[in-house]
Each structure stands twice: as C-alpha cells, then as structure tokens.
Amino acid sequence: MNPLIFSTILATIIMGTAIVMTSSHWLTIWIGFEMNMLAIIPMLMKQHNPRSTEAATKYFLTQATASMLLMLAVIMNLTHTGQWTITKSFNPLASIIMTIALTMKLGLSPFHFWVPEVAQGIPLSSCLILLTWQKLAPLSILYMISPTINLNLLLSMSLISVAIGGWGGLNQTQLRKIMAYSSIAHMGWMTAILAYNPTMTMLNLLVYITMTTTMFMLLIKSASTTTLSLAIMWNKVPLVTTLTLTIMLSLGGLPPLTGFLPKWMIIQELTKNNNIIMPTLMAIMALLSLYFYMRLTYATTLTMFPTTNNMKMKWQFEPKKHMNLLSPLIVMSTLTLPLAPMMSLLD
C-alpha cells in the first residue's frame, strides 16, 4: 500500500475513534463510527484476494447494521427526551436497542459470528487493529451510558460470550481464529463488570490490548498463522517461540501471569456486589480458554506435528523485523501481577 494512502487511512481511523470518545452528541458519535468503519475497510483488503474481500464485506455489513440500530435507538430516545446529547435518562426500549448495536460492533455473543470469519481473512497487522483499536469506540460509548444499560441483558450476553469464546477456540488450528475467540471471551469479562465498576472495565481493556498487541507482534515477527507453523518455529526463532507460548498462557489467565489480574479483580468486584453465581460460572468457563491455550502450548513444545524434514528446517531468510516496543510489552504482558496490591487505590 502506498505510504501516503496508508498514513491517510490510519489518521482517519484514529480521528474517527477520537471523535466517538470525545463527543456528547449522538450525531457526531455516529459520524465518528462511520469514519472509522469506512477507513478500516481498505486496511482489511490489503492483500487483494477473494478471502480479504469477503472478510471486508462481512465487516461492512455487520457494522452498517449496527450503525443503523444505533441511529434507531438515538431517534427513539430523541422522541422520548427531546435532546441529542448523552443523558442519564434513556428510554428502556431504546437502551436495549443501543446495547445490541454496540455489542454487535464489539463482537459480543450472540452477535459474534463475524469476528472469527473476518479475522481469518485479513493480514495479521489488520487483525491486530480489528481486535484492539476497534474495540475502543464502542466500549467508550457503553462506558458513558453504563448507568442506563439493562443489567440482565448485558450480564446474559457477557456470560454467553465467555462460554462461546472458550468453546469456539477448542477445535481451531488457525491462530487468527483462536485470537478472535479469545477476544470474544475477553469482551465478555469486560462487559460483565461494566455496570458495577466501569473503571475496572477500562483497566481490563488496557491489559487485554497489551497482551493481544504483544501476541500479534510475535506472530508477525515469526510469520506464523497456524499451529503447524508455530510448532516448527523452534529452529527459526527459538526465543520468540518461548515468549509466544508464555503470552498465550497469560491470555488464558494462568495465575502467575498478567492475564490473571483482571479476571481476579472482576470476580472480586462481582462478589462484593452479592453476585455469586455469575463469577462462578465465568471462572468455570474461563477454564475452556485456558485449556485450548495449554493444549496449543503442549502441541508446540512437547510434540512434533507430522511434517517432512524440509518443513522442520524452516529457516528465516527474510530481513529481520525490528520491533522496539516488543520487549517492554512482553514484560507488561507477563509480570504485571505483582503490581496487584496497587489496584486497591482504585477503590
């Protein structure tokens, strides 16, 4: 892609998200969402193949439907309150439609079907933007309207998302699909605590973006897109193999690593609010995600896939990719748990 065009598209994506996050007028928010959506479509189609075109079309149709529902909810609320600004008073039916629209943009279950399909058809760099940056705008609006959200609807969607995120990744061999299902599960955890403690949702989002960015940077560095390519990476970039598997376990929420921190805090917060069943079910379902990450780790380190010898000797002849941010991101993605006592300052 031409550097000038790429810079323009990237600036538009950033500007669209910034407009959504800083606006209090619904029409401006809608314009920001549309700018963001139309700008990212060329990023999804960088490879110019039918798979990328299909992924971009699915993304466009889903986001356009969500934007239509968002405007429907805004107009319904306009007839109820008589103003365009985000207010604490919200028509109950409009609130439900708004929640559905925003969860569709986030890829929350039961509107999650587009996420794995779109992620699988696009390059790793575009997939990174899709699963991290594109979550900021919808989550910021959910954060703003959190006092008016239908709690039962949001908690139900969160619980289903954690379950689907675990079940969906069990039989996957494509790393982009695994990351997509992991994203669905993490979104479930974030939205579960949104109505009780929105600040904790933002903290969870920060940890999720850090871990996912680290994971994708490692995959881009090693040019791995399947479990097979990950398994034969040991003689290509051995250190990166070890780090990739550690980040995977952190994403799964294994206790000594950073990924356990947000889950621990969310379970604690839900329990404080006398909601015992919800965190119990979510913790059980989180084991599904941890299982497929551990299975992937086992398959990569302790077994060898049936391949020919020349596949095992897969050397890295392409120029080395320099990633200056990778080292601090790896540290943050694995060693932040000791900072947990400082989180008491949030209370």
UniProtKB/Swiss-Prot annotation:
The chain crosses the membrane at residues 1-21, 25-45, 59-79, 96-116, 127-147, 149-169, 178-198, 200-220, 247-267, 276-296, 325-345. Its main location: mitochondrion. Signal peptide: none annotated. It comes from the Eukaryota. Its EC number is 7.1.1.2. The keyword Cell wall biogenesis/degradation does not apply. It is found in: Mitochondrion inner membrane. It is a multi-pass membrane protein. Keywords: Electron transport, Membrane, Mitochondrion, Mitochondrion inner membrane, NAD, Respiratory chain, Translocase, Transmembrane, Transmembrane helix, Transport, Ubiquinone. Pfam families: NADH_dehy_S2_C, Proton_antipo_M. One of its GO terms (biological process) is mitochondrial respiratory chain complex I assembly. Core subunit of respiratory chain NADH dehydrogenase (Complex I) which is composed of 45 different subunits. Interacts with TMEM242. Core subunit of the mitochondrial membrane respiratory chain NADH dehydrogenase (Complex I) which catalyzes electron transfer from NADH through the respiratory chain, using ubiquinone as an electron acceptor. Essential for the catalytic activity and assembly of complex I. This is NADH-ubiquinone oxidoreductase chain 2.
